[in-house]
Amino acid sequence: KKVRIGIVGAGRIGNVHAQSITYHIPEAEVVCVTDVYEPAAKKLAETYGIPKYGADFHMIIDDPTIDAVLVCSPTPTHADIAMAAMKAGKDVFCEKPVDLTIEKIKATEQVAKETGRKLQIGFNRRFDHNHGRVQQLAKSGKLGNIEIVKITSRDPEPPSPEYAASSGGLYIDMMIHDFDMAMF
C-alpha cells in the first residue's frame, strides 16, 4: 500500500515536494494539495496529477484516507497545521522553522509525543550526499580537530521583503540550514 500524502502549501517548496514524491518515491502518492490561494493548489494538482485540491487545509486533516501531511505553508501557520494533523492521526513532515516561538515549538513537540505520530522537520541537507560525506570525514577524525566551519549557501533568488518578515528573516528561515549542518 502506498503512503497517501496531503500537501499544505502550493508555493515553491510545496512544488518541490510534489515533484519529488511524484517522480522519485514510488511507495508514496500525493492525493491532495491545499493552498489559501486556490489557483496555486489547482495548478500544482494539474501539474502532478493530484486528484484533489482546495483552499482549506482541513480537507486534508479531515480525510481519513490520508496518512501523512507535508506542511509547506507560510511559517506562521506551521505549528498549528502540524498539531492539527497529528491530533487527526497523521504523520507530519513540517518545513522549518516549526514556529517563531519556543513555546509553540515545544507545544508541537508535545503533541507529537502525546499522539505517537511521527514529526520530521525539513532539515533536508542532512540527507544530501555531499553533506553526508563531509560529516563522515569529520566524525572519522580525518579532518583533524575542527575549530571553524565556513558554510556558503545559495538560493535561486533572495526572498521578498514580505517573506523575510513573516518567516523569521534570514537567520531563522534560511541560515537555520547552516546552523543545522554545523551541529549535525
Could you tell me what each predicted segment is?
Residues 125-184:
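Predominantly a Rossmann-like dinucleotide-binding segment in NAD(P)-dependent oxidoreductases
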Residues 41, 81, 108, 134, ...:
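Aromatic/hydrophobic pocket-lining residues that form π-stacking "cages" and hydrophobic walls in ligand
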Residues 107-124, 144-150:
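Rossmann-fold dehydrogenase core element
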Residues 28-32, 67-69, 169:
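Short active-site oxyanion
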Residues 32, 52, 68, 118, ...:
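Short, Asp-centered acidic motifs that coordinate Mg2+ and/or phosphate
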